[in-house]
């Protein structure tokens, strides 16, 4: 298994994210059709849905190849997961998450980075970073990067 993509955000389009399959050897990794394993992804697309609750922001990103559901947690101040963290760090994380959530508006083009996972049989991204893009070419450039990386990095070559 190729572990070179485990520590990086793989740039993928929605269609590729939806086609990920659970890795048979690791619970938090998913396999691309080419054979490479990923756990973190990056996608750029238009925000098509937005559902804000006190605990999280759930939004949909459509890049033309499909739509991926993204979840950004906003409960850093009340979650027991963060109870052992430094309070200053928790405040910083909570503040950053709230600012990023405010940028996510329907119709905006956004870049989302986070951990990929499956929830009720559907692939989704648990977003660490979600920022609105100001560059009108960002989505097209992301597509071109995905094509190039798909051909050069994400395909596992069998050495004979």
UniProtKB/Swiss-Prot annotation:
<dbReference type="InterPro" id="IPR004365">
    <property type="entry name" value="NA-bd_OB_tRNA"/>
</dbReference>
<dbReference type="InterPro" id="IPR012340">
    <property type="entry name" value="NA-bd_OB-fold"/>
</dbReference>
<dbReference type="GO" id="GO:0003677">
    <property type="term" value="F:DNA binding"/>
</dbReference>
<dbReference type="InterPro" id="IPR040260">
    <property type="entry name" value="RFA2-like"/>
</dbReference>
<comment type="similarity">
    <text>Belongs to the STN1 family.</text>
</comment>
<comment type="function">
    <text>Component of the CST complex, a complex that binds to single-stranded DNA and is required to protect telomeres from DNA degradation. The CST complex binds single-stranded DNA with high affinity in a sequence-independent manner, while isolated subunits bind DNA with low affinity by themselves. Associates with enzymatically active telomerase. Plays a genomewide role in DNA replication and facilitates re-replication at non-telomeric loci.</text>
</comment>
<feature type="DNA-binding region" description="OB">
    <location>
        <begin position="41"/>
        <end position="133"/>
    </location>
</feature>
<dbReference type="Pfam" id="PF01336">
    <property type="entry name" value="tRNA_anti-codon"/>
</dbReference>
<keyword id="KW-0539">Nucleus</keyword>
<dbReference type="GO" id="GO:0000781">
    <property type="term" value="C:chromosome, telomeric region"/>
</dbReference>
<protein>
    <recommendedName>
        <fullName>CST complex subunit STN1</fullName>
    </recommendedName>
</protein>
<keyword id="KW-0238">DNA-binding</keyword>
<keyword id="KW-0158">Chromosome</keyword>
<comment type="subunit">
    <text>Component of the CST complex, composed of CTC1, TEN1 and STN1. Interacts with CTC1. Interacts with TEN1. Interacts with POT1A. In vitro interaction with TEN1 and POT1A is mutually exclusive, indicating that POT1A and TEN1 may compete for the same binding site.</text>
</comment>
<keyword id="KW-0779">Telomere</keyword>
<dbReference type="GO" id="GO:0016233">
    <property type="term" value="P:telomere capping"/>
</dbReference>
<dbReference type="GO" id="GO:0005634">
    <property type="term" value="C:nucleus"/>
</dbReference>
């Amino acid at each position: 298994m190729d572990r070179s993509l485990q520590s990086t955000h793989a740039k993928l389009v929605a269609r590729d994210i939806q086609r990920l399959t659970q890795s048979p050897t690791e619970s938090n990794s998913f396999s691309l059709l080419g054979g490479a394993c990923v756990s973190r992804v990056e996608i750029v697309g238009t925000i098509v849905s937005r559902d804000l609750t006190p605990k999280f922001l759930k939004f949909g990103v459509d890049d033309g190849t499909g739509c991926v559901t993204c979840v950004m947690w906003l409960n850093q101040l009340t979650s027991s997961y963060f109870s052992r963290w430094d309070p200053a760090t928790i405040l910083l994380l909570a503040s950053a998450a709230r600012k990023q959530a405010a940028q996510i508006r329907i119709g905006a083009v956004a870049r989302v980075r986070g951990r990929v996972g499956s929830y009720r049989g559907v692939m989704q991204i648990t977003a660490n970073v979600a920022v609105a893009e100001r560059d009108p070419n960002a989505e097209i450039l992301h597509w071109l990067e995905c094509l190039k990386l798909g051909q050069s990095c994400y395909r596992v070559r069998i050495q004979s």
